[in-house]
Amino acid sequence: MYSSNIKTIRACNGMLFVFYYSQGSIFFVKIHKGSSSASVKIADNASPMFSVWCTDNGIYIMFNGDQGTVLCFYNYSRWVSRIIAKDLGESCSRISFFTDGESVHLLYSIKNINSNTESLFIRSMKKDKWEQPKKVSDIMPFPNTPYFIGRENNDKIKIYYRISDKTIKYRSLNLCDGNMTEAENLLATSMPCYDISILTKNDESHILYLAQGMYSSQLIYKGIKSGRQIKARVIWEGQLSGSCLLFCNNGRLYALMYLSLIHI
């Protein structure tokens, strides 16, 4: 998914699609073999931020309009659209979009009034029929996002979130049937989160957590392999702050940390 107001998608047939926002409307242009089509308007009264997703069957666009959240689908011959939610609006802090065959899934987080918590929901469409939203959990957002997503395989994703007692949990979502596993604990720490990085690889989950205390900071690692929990361990500690990143290269797991000195 993308979050700027101009984006491109290359379809399976090799055709390039350019989508852009202008003066309250969303347009697209088709480019093929060096020639471009005229601009075609997709929607009016749209917000500048919209998301685009491409599948073998066509292209999806999701945006907020004056009537609610709208999902448009293009089957490479015509556009169809429908309102999928009327009550998200500005209360929605993040929304993610997934497809698998005839199934479509929306994962979104709603801010709770007069609280630092949010509520995480999943809503699925099967064979052109939308089901009622299902609540995943009440969550406490991370510093830069309410939740994280990792892909186990083509049919499953993992949803990572934090609850009010600062425990980080995860649930697996089957994109084919929309079923979710029960919540599992990933990491529990009482120290405030400064930065976090989560990596999903097949049935493995790895988390790097930069916790900042009053007098020192800790970089904590924990992993899950084949359903077996690896004991959390502190791999760095000191009076520094910064950001952290997990990545995999040639079968090896690396932890990267950018440090900035704290002046006391």
Regions found by a protein language model. Give the residues of each.
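Extracellular, repeat-based ectodomains that mediate carbohydrate processing or recognition
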Residues: 1-262
